[in-house]
Amino acid sequence: WKTVRFGIEGAYPPFSWTEADGSLKGFDVDMANALCKEMQVKCKIVAQDWDGIIPSLLARKYDAIIAAMSITEERKKKVDFTGKYALIPNKFIAKKGAGLDFDNLDGQKIAVQRATTHDKYLTDNYGDKVEIVRYGSFDEAYLDLANGRVAAVLGDASALEEGVLNKAGGEAYEFVGPSLTDPKWFGEGFGIAVRKQDKDLTKKLDAAILSLREKGVYQEIAAKYFNYDVYGQ
């Protein structure tokens, strides 16, 4: 491997976002660059919408996905994963004083990003009770939360913090209900996805993640984006 191409969503801060000039920034982008440096390969970052992120890997548009993707049994049928590089709890966010009762969510509209672990969790646990509203990106979900079209959004705590709470007007919102980490739905943390035939690349990436943690580079990058230990237990 002389060059490794990483597929990144570019619409999921603090993991990735797109600047006005089209360049990608965020934790996943910094991690990709640091991993390439550690593996002594050239790095190429490819922006890819979430809906097509695994198909585009299989179609060789890039070699690995680093996009806050949870390691789940379902995804493992299609791709291989490195060990985790982050683990984040999942939470609901709503307007302050919305008074949502999590023992009785009947008829409430809850927003998720389509084809995510959050989507699957809601479908399996609340599918017959709530109206699940699915969006192509989190930004669209936030808009509908602000407009009162949905009662709550379910997502990664860090993405909700960055996308809503830390933004202008964020003080009008709060985390509500339980913190969700059940591996059955949310997997074993975020991993880097690689095509099954590229076992050598998965091994290289695993070794590089370990090395970045041992050298303290991982912690330096993480501290730019998170004020807690994003690696988890």
Residue ranges and their predicted role:
Residues 1-68, 224, 228:
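Extracytoplasmic small-molecule ligand-binding "clamshell" domains
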Residues 29-38, 98, 108-109, 114-117, ...:
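Extended ligand-binding regions for polar small-molecule ligands
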Residues 120-136, 171-176, 206-233:
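Ligand-binding clefts/hinges and TM-proximal coupling segments of bilobed small-molecule sensing domains
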